[in-house]
């Protein structure tokens, strides 16, 4: 029993360090694939141009703003390691959530399992070196989920604030993260109602309305992008999208039609 506790202690302290070394290796390169090159090009734009392009052709500018600030903080230039490093740091932050927050909510054993299986997932190694917003979204969505469970156990104003801020950051990361946050809020509401946690209802709706209000300016942009893409897919420039085009657009969210087979097997 004592040896098991010692091993768990070593893993609890060592896994984030191992993750940093493994994932950090992926940022020591100047190679970029197409989407990463797009992110790099956005960083090179002026602030006004960056906002304009994201409003017409992309997700919200939240990730690109963070990336641009971090890139210039690291000195800028033509080397792209700083772009990848930001993803590595957010993945490390995700691991630290597993180390400290999961331990607080559950115990050290669960914390070790959380970090170990996260480290063993190949897709996490991919995203750690990916100059895209997925590592950022993973961090904030995980913080949203953990803080929600923390609130469910014992609510405080501070926890609600953390939950609300994490939710806002998540919905501004990526359109798919927005959908995931919405579904999570529905799940959280169901848990509150089923377990009859009436004292949480007020805080839940205050948080939900706050997130909705803060995101509302970009929600209009997202809806416009949604309609424009469906019109483009239908070959129409004037008519509203049909139900079939809506269903065709949503297939990316809930099917593996455009997902690599290897990743599909991984998620299953």
Regions found by a protein language model. Give the residues of each.
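Conserved small/polar residues in nucleotide/adenosyl-binding loops
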Residues: 1-9, 264-268
């Amino acid at each position: 029993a004592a040896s098991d506790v010692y091993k768990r202690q070593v893993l609890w302290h060592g896994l984030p360090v191992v993750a940093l070394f493994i994932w950090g290796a992926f940022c020591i390169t100047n190679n970029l694939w197409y989407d990463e090159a797009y992110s790099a090009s956005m960083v090179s734009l002026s602030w006004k141009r960056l906002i304009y392009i994201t409003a017409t052709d992309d997700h919200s500018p939240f990730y690109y703003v963070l990336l641009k600030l971090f890139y210039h903080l690291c000195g800028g230039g033509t080397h792209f390691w700083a772009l990848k490093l930001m993803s590595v740091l957010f993945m490390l932050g995700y691991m630290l959530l597993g180390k400290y927050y999961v331990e607080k909510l559950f115990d050290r054993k669960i914390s070790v399992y959380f970090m170990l299986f996260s480290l063993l997932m190949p897709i996490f190694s991919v995203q750690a070196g990916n100059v895209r917003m997925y590592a950022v979204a993973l961090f904030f969505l995980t913080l949203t989920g953990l803080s929600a469970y923390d609130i469910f156990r014992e609510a405080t104003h501070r926890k609600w604030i953390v939950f609300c801020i994490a939710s806002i950051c998540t919905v501004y990361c990526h359109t798919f993260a927005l959908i995931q946050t919405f579904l999570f809020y529905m799940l959280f509401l169901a848990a509150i109602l089923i377990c009859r946690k009436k004292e949480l209802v007020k805080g839940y709706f205050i948080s939900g309305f706050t997130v909705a209000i803060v995101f509302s300016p970009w929600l209009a942009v997202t809806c416009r992008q949604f309609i424009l893409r469906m019109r483009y897919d239908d070959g129409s420039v004037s008519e509203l999208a049909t139900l079939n085009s809506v269903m065709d657009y949503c297939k990316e969210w809930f099917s593996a039609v455009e997902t690599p087979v290897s990743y599909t097997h991984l998620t299953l």
